[in-house]
Amino acid sequence: MEILLVNDDGIYSNGLLALKNVICEEFDANVTVVAPTNQQSGIGRAISLFEPLRITKTKLADCSEGYAVSGTPTDCVVLGVHQVLKKVPDYIISGINIGENLGTEITTSGTLGAAFEGAHHGAKSFACSLQVTTDHLKFKEGESPIEFMTAARIVKNVFKKFLDDEFPCDVVNINVPDNATENTPVEITKLAKRMYSMHVEERIDPRSRSYYWLDGYPVMDEEDGTDVYAVRNKRNVSVTPLTLDNTAKNIDEFKEKYGKKF
């Protein structure tokens, strides 16, 4: 079994290391780590088209070997498949992300971007994230004081359920609440409409020009059955099946209404 591990928090993230260690302990698999040199949160599925990329062999905190890529998480998947492994792995797992990836805002996530790129290449792909409620830790680069081993074991247990089965979707998105134990219930969910209520903060620089910081406030009031409600209200692990096909579900209605207008 060939597994490629990627993330968007950078190759020295404790979340990535915890996931690698748990996967290596549990499975007889060839596990390869290819991750960004620097923090890439919020980059989505961006790919580097206008600058060259470099791959650097490096040592992780446990002295195992990984490959640092001077680009995005999607670049890591592309180079991991075409240059490092030179083949499509059986599985691509992206994470563990520092902070949950919920709702339709997953399109901005580098963690999900890498997983979708993996699915695009034909690998069975997973994205995994741990809820973080302390804002200053969410975009921390490198080592973090957050405890990831429980989340890693939960991800491993979910991952095991899909082994040897016909893969039911393109990407499985796993989100673990910050207080989870290995006995925390797992719930199959759909995407909520939103994870954050967007906020723009305006500031003034020393030359009296405006500049802006983008952030948001966590949404809590999504409906039951969504990933946001499962993680933030019920404190369950959410498992959401995702597809690369972004075609609207009501395409037949769309054709009926607009098809004759063209």
Swiss-Prot record:
Cofactor dependency: a divalent metal cation
Enzyme class, first EC level, given as a word: hydrolase
One Gene Ontology term of the molecular function aspect: nucleotide binding
Binding site for a divalent metal cation: D8, D9, S41, N97
Assigned protein family: Belongs to the SurE nucleotidase family.
Keyword terms: Cytoplasm, Hydrolase, Metal-binding, Nucleotide-binding
Key word Metal-binding present: yes
InterPro entries: SurE (IPR030048), SurE-like_Pase/nucleotidase (IPR002828), SurE-like_sf (IPR036523)
Location within or outside the cell: Cytoplasm
Protein's name in the database: 5'-nucleotidase SurE
Cofactor binding, per record: Binds 1 divalent metal cation per subunit.
Enzyme nomenclature, EC number: 3.1.3.5
Reactions listed under catalytic activity: a ribonucleoside 5'-phosphate + H2O = a ribonucleoside + phosphate
Organism lineage: Archaea, Methanobacteriati, Methanobacteriota, Methanomada group, Methanococci
Pfam families per record: SurE
Cross-referenced HAMAP family: SurE
GO CC list: cytoplasm
Protein task: Nucleotidase that shows phosphatase activity on nucleoside 5'-monophosphates.
